[in-house]
Amino acid sequence: MNRQSLFILTGLSGSGKSTAMEAFEDAGYYCVDNMPIELLPKFLDLPLDSDTDINGFAFVMDIRAKQFLSQFPSVLESLGKNGHIPEIIFLEADENILLKRYSQTRRHHPAGQDKSLIESIKSEKSLMLPIRKISKRIIDTSNYNVHQLKAEIRNIAHHHALKPVSMKINLLSFGFKYGIPTDADLVVDMRFLSNPFFVPELKALNGRTKEVKDFVLETIQAKTFLKKYLGLLDYLIPLYTLEGKAYLTIAVGCTGGRHRSVAIAENIFEHLSQRGFEPGIIHRDIDRDTKEL
């Protein structure tokens, strides 16, 4: 396993470790929360398929596991001898912030037992000090919201990923007469283009055929639209990726979802494919109007 692909997320309870783990998961990492420290070496020695689709590993470890503090130094040494050099990320926050977060969630603090909440927070902070000292990265999340923390962790995850992380893009053609897709992020209406449905020799065909594509795409209106819209997508997609958006569904509609929307969606698909993406495409209503032909 690549040495840069192993992370241990640790730190104070309430500092955002679960949020950090979600960011690693979104970046294609295999993640385990509350991993028993004694099982880590055995887990990392398990064989992986050569074609496994994993960018790396991220394990959340903290005082919830009874043996964590006592065994962590020896396990870390053992990992190093076997070629596994984890990057330790220590998350923390101001005591007042942790107190506020726990008060809002009403969860029990793992260092609680018979102590008050503030005493538990102080106790954990003291217990975790040796781990903090050996951590490569210390992130204070006091002034972070969820999105800001995910963005910082995502930058770390992407930098060490074994392969580039890209957003999943799906194209969906549809007919407005059958309803707008509820899961669409972007919806564009092609009903301003001339409708092949009213051309006798094109009526029975669909937007995947050369005849319909030529009819739809060769108009000045379609060419102007595609120039502007494809430029907009080229601008938006990197920004969506930067914000951590994992999926983008682009819905292209016309009246029945058989001709214009299909031809335009196919053109957008080709453009995104040429840009290095691997978009999916579904023509939801392409066969819905066949009984009316």
From Swiss-Prot:
Q: Which GO terms describe its molecular function?
A: ATP binding; GTP binding
List positions binding ATP. 11-18
Q: List the InterPro entries.
A: P-loop_NTPase, RapZ-like, RapZ-like_N, RapZ_C
Decide whether keyword ATP-binding is in the record. yes
Q: Which UniProt keywords apply?
A: ATP-binding, GTP-binding, Nucleotide-binding
Q: Is Nucleotide-binding one of the keywords?
A: yes
Q: Which Pfam families match?
A: PapZ_C, RapZ-like_N
- Out of the domains of life, which is the source? Bacteria
What residues does GTP bind to? 62-65
PANTHER family recorded: RNASE ADAPTER PROTEIN RAPZ
Tell me, in a sentence or two, what this protein's role is: Displays ATPase and GTPase activities.
Give the family per the record.
Belongs to the RapZ-like family.
What is the name of the protein in this document?
Answer: Nucleotide-binding protein HRM2_27900
